[in-house]
Amino acid sequence: MTRGAWMCRQYDDGLKIWLAAPRENEKPFIDSERAQKWRLSLASLLFFTVLLSDHLWFCAEAKLTRARDKEHQQQQRQQQQQQQQQRQRQQQQQQRRQQEPSWPALLASMGESSPAAQAHRLLSASSSPTLPPSPGDGGGGGGKGNRGKDDRGKALFLGNSAKPVWRLETCYPQGASSGQCFTVENADAVCARNWSRGAAGGDGQEVRSKHPTPLWNLSDFYLSFCNSYTLWELFSGLSSPNTLNCSLDVVLKEGGEMTTCRQCVEAYQDYDHHAQEKYEEFESVLHKYLQSEEYSVKSCPEDCKIVYKAWLCSQYFEVTQFNCRKTIPCKQYCLEVQTRCPFILPDNDEVIYGGLSSFICTGLYETFLTNDEPECCDVRREEKSNNPSKGTVEKSGSCHRTSLTVSSATRLCNSRLKLCVLVLILLHTVLTASAAQNTAGLSFGGINTLEENSTNEE
């Protein structure tokens, strides 16, 4: 009865019914809010699912492209190895033919003279010296060119030495003196030769009459690893390795001791060996930490290795190179390495950072370059030549690169996936916070209505 009276009084007082609405009317409003939240969450999940699938497909395509590139590179390496094996076989066959004891007699019976006799005849008939002139001149004399044309492929044994010196197929650097190129392996076999004194000796004819064996040229002997440096350049520029006196006057001294020459050549070989060790360490670091070979649009690991080798050899042998088509200051190779080699980040190999390079040149701008600075052959110019002529080293072809998108995708797939997961977590947090705020607002609204009802009742 009390309830009926209250309801009547509520109706008589003219109060609106929605102030004391039943709970059944609140349920559709709450259901619509929940449905809207579910729609937002499902839409966001669908969007990020599509985004993740797109990135996964992108990464899979990049991996397939990279696998194809690796197969192509392996095929190229196999072809290069086969070519090297064929060249080694040809060299071994040439060595076997020249090691036969009866080949001079056979040549004499066929009406041809031995290579030593031909070289001696050319030297006696030529009026130009066999030693290359000063670095400012272009090359050797005419007799040198004739000797390179006649004896190319024959003089593997130096004089009467029983130990052969390995002969290079092509001469490095470009524009070599005579076309005859040898690597320095045995210091005794090299120092036992009769070296040409060139224009320094005024009694050239007397020397030729006293020594029937041919005079060898220092510019025809190269180091094994730093194969762009000749003995002529080393004896001319680096005259004191390991506190030794290795000047040209000492080496070319007639009747001098062979001990000094051998010690100098062995010192140069030690420097060359240390440079090769440092290069192998750098190559192992590249192989270990460099994920993708296509790290740049303008450069590749082969370009980096070429300029790094040139810079490394220029640090061990600070001499000027003579037989080059174009020379640059040797210190400039440091900048080439800095710009062509990649940024190596051992701490995190998945994320690409911008900033300083892993190879930084120091001390280049402190001292100005003068004319006394040594100059080296420009390998940047030589590596661009696609058709190497005789007397040059055969360079590898251009780097096989894929597109920038594919090359960058192989390194950014994992980081993008992590970024998408992080965005999903943040979205879930935002939705949860908004839902909590809405529920709090509804509860506060209910409390306000109850308070209003209580005041109305009073």
From Swiss-Prot:
Protein name: NALCN channel auxiliary factor 1
GO BP: calcium ion import across plasma membrane
Keywords assigned by UniProt, alphabetized: Cell membrane, Disulfide bond, Glycoprotein, Membrane, Transmembrane, Transmembrane helix
Assembly description: Component of the NALCN channel complex. NALCN complex consists of NALCN and auxiliary subunits, UNC79, UNC80 and NACL1. These auxiliary subunits are essential for the NALCN channel function.
Source organism of this protein record: Homo sapiens (Human)
InterPro entries cross-referenced by the UniProt entry: NALCN_aux_factor_1/2
SUPFAM superfamilies in UniProt: beta-sandwich domain of Sec23/24
Function: Auxillary component of the NALCN sodium channel complex, a channel that regulates the resting membrane potential and controls neuronal excitability.
Transmembrane segments: 40-60, 417-437
Biased composition (Gly residues): 136-145
